[in-house]
């Protein structure tokens, strides 16, 4: 505010800037920024997505193991082939697909969290190219959640196996 304060010292420029941004544009004013808007808020969101993804992935791995130990049975779907060598077998493919989508989402989240807060003298436009991939990071996460939900919907508890192992 140095130059403009010299010309108009009677105006509270920080307050005037805040009022202008919030009233005319309807966004939250950020008083501590350089020539470009910081991307800290995006990094926090991406880190939150990654943490949630890790919970989903952990559930996927646990369900895969519970299915392999026969604590859960998968309900076969008419017309679906489980395996090329054992068509009668039902693979936990939904959980495996979810894991893969979590890995892709997390890779993008980490990469974007590392890239977005950096700028070359506030003149760097590479953040705009990077931000075009936010949809991919969120999309892979949503696909992972969807696959896990679909996998869980195909599972039933194998009470006989649980009782057998507990006795």
Predicted region positions:
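Internal glycine-rich alpha/beta core junctions
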Residues: 1-118
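Glycine-rich cofactor/substrate-binding loops
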Residues: 71, 83-167
């Amino acid at each position: 505010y140095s130059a403009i304060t010299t010309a108009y010292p009677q105006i509270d420029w920080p307050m005037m800037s805040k009022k202008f941004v919030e009233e005319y544009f309807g966004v939250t004013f950020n008083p501590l920024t350089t020539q470009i808007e910081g991307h800290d808020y995006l990094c926090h969101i991406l880190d939150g997505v990654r943490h949630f993804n890790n919970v989903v992935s952990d559930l996927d791995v646990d369900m895969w193991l519970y299915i392999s130990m026969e604590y859960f049975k998968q309900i076969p779907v008419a017309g679906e082939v489980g395996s090329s060598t054992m068509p009668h077998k039902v693979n936990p493919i939904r959980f495996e697909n979810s894991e893969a989508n979590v890995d892709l989402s997390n890779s993008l989240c980490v990469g974007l969290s590392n890239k977005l807060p950096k700028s070359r003298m506030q003149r760097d436009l590479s953040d705009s190219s990077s931000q075009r991939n936010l949809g991919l990071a969120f999309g892979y996460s949503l696909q992972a959640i969807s696959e896990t939900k679909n996998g869980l919907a195909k599972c039933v508890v194998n009470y006989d196996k649980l009782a057998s192992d507990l006795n």
